[in-house]
């Protein structure tokens, strides 16, 4: 059985463990009410739907409001499913994780707007000198000749960068502060401060 929780990225800091400083990301995680339980009998798979961050009923449409009332919980800003997770009780708190445990963190990366191929895809660019003129940051050739006579799908080119779902795997839980609903994770987590973060048990079972 896997486990997971929703939270908000607070920011990064460092704490001392013994005689060394450890960089950590602070996440305000939970409490997350259980909004729906899905079973193989009714839905074809096992999952639980968790909510996070209450919001006003005025901001909820009628179908959503009925969904929340059926579960007996206040309207939530975020709803996410966790497969093969069967929590005990009606609320999931940050204490489902323990210090030293490995987790996967999923967030939405920071938006960078429209960027060229050097920043977006780490292209080398053109020559800086020796006759090069207005070619320093260009991508170069993007195709072949009359055959195939088109640019292949997926060709790495300039365009919108960031604002994508990113998962960082096998991050270590440095500290859990259950009384404050805080979890301190070693290293960086994708996204801006205040963004939604999904924390799940490590899929690859990191050591």
Swiss-Prot record:
Keywords: Ribonucleoprotein, Ribosomal protein, RNA-binding, rRNA-binding
One annotated GO biological process: translation
SUPFAM superfamilies linked: Translation proteins
Signal peptide annotation: none
Single GO cellular component term: cytosolic large ribosomal subunit
Spans annotated as Disordered: 126-149
RNA-binding keyword on record: yes
Family, as annotated: Belongs to the universal ribosomal protein uL3 family.
Main function: One of the primary rRNA binding proteins, it binds directly near the 3'-end of the 23S rRNA, where it nucleates assembly of the 50S subunit.
Subunit structure: Part of the 50S ribosomal subunit. Forms a cluster with proteins L14 and L19.
Name the record gives this protein: Large ribosomal subunit protein uL3
Source species of the chain: Deinococcus geothermalis (strain DSM 11300 / CIP 105573 / AG-3a)
Organism lineage: Bacteria, Thermotogati, Deinococcota, Deinococci, Deinococcales
Gene name for this UniProt entry: rplC
